[in-house]
């Protein structure tokens, strides 16, 4: 790599369950019309600022895959290599998947709700195998035994960072502009690593949907601008506030 490397992070556009305020996790829901528009706009922002990715990384979930496709189309970069991995998936919300966030908060109380939703190392109760929103029979995850039954953010860090270091970093060091289209919590895990955030500080980090976040990294892959730079700062601030109010996921 030269003196700097460029990494762009993008959370998928608004999903159907974001709109309904449901815990989503590994449940494979699509984008809303608003989410599709956010994805297109994110690609337009990349093109307008000359920030053209050479390679794309995304998860195995359609809301991220669709966002990536729409963004690359808008940026005229559909032809670049695409690499998908379950390690970029959203945090698995266990037995909370499919539940209404407001109803869950009312049932279990503010303290327990916040511990499950935002703490670094407290996972929700595990999902029951074979239940409606479990993934144990999903062929995407056959080689990992159906995937986790629940996760906290610390678990996402453990599964994502080795992939980042072993697979994505070589592309950065070779001089490629890398675009990662993923999810609120998988991106929070990566931002925690990039910005060397404490376990306590990352609790308050919210990633808005559909707005590219640019990181220029030095030779040690440390950000030249801590926290990176959103390509639409005003929309990002409003979006992060909206995520904080509903819990993300």
Curated annotation (Swiss-Prot):
The record marks 183 as: Transition state stabilizer. Substrate binds at residues 11-18, 24-25, 63, 90-93, 101, 117-118, 184-185. It catalyses: (2R)-2-phosphoglycerate = (2R)-3-phosphoglycerate. Keywords: Gluconeogenesis, Glycolysis, Isomerase. Pfam families: His_Phos_1. Pathway: Carbohydrate degradation; glycolysis; pyruvate from D-glyceraldehyde 3-phosphate: step 3/5. The active site is at 12 (tele-phosphohistidine intermediate), 90 (proton donor/acceptor). Residues 119-138 are annotated as: Disordered. The keyword Isomerase applies. PROSITE patterns: PG_MUTASE (PS00175). GO terms for biological process: gluconeogenesis; glycolytic process. SUPFAM superfamilies: Phosphoglycerate mutase-like. GO terms for molecular function: phosphoglycerate mutase activity. CDD domains: HP_PGM_like. Its EC number is 5.4.2.11. The keyword Membrane does not apply. Belongs to the phosphoglycerate mutase family. BPG-dependent PGAM subfamily. Catalyzes the interconversion of 2-phosphoglycerate and 3-phosphoglycerate. This is 2,3-bisphosphoglycerate-dependent phosphoglycerate mutase.
């Amino acid at each position: 790599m030269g003196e700097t490397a460029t990494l762009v992070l993008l959370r998928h556009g608004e999903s159907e369950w974001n709109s309904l305020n449901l815990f989503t996790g590994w449940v494979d829901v699509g984008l809303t019309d608003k989410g599709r528009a956010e994805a297109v706009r994110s690609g337009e922002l990349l093109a307008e600022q000359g920030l053209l990715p050479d390679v794309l990384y995304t998860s195995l979930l359609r809301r991220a895959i669709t966002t990536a496709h729409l963004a690359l189309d808008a940026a005229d970069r559909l032809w670049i290599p695409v690499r998908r991995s379950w390690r970029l998936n959203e945090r698995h919300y266990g037995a909370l998947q499919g539940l209404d966030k407001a109803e869950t908060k009312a049932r279990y109380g503010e303290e327990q709700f916040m511990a499950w939703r935002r703490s670094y190392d407290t996972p929700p109760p595990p999902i029951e195998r074979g239940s409606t929103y479990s993934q144990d029979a999903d062929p995407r995850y056959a080689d990992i035994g159906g995937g986790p039954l629940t996760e906290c953010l610390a678990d996402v860090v453990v599964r994502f960072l080795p992939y980042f270091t072993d697979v994505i970093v070589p592309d950065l060091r070779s001089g490629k502009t890398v675009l990662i289209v993923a999810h609120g919590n998988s991106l929070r895990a990566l931002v925690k690593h990039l910005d060397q955030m404490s376990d306590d500080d990352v609790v308050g980090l919210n990633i808005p949907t559909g707005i590219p976040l640019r990181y220029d990294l030095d030779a040690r892959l440390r950000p030249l601008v801590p926290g990176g730079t959103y390509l639409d700062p005003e929309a990002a601030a409003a979006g992060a506030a909206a995520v904080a109010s509903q819990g993300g996921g």
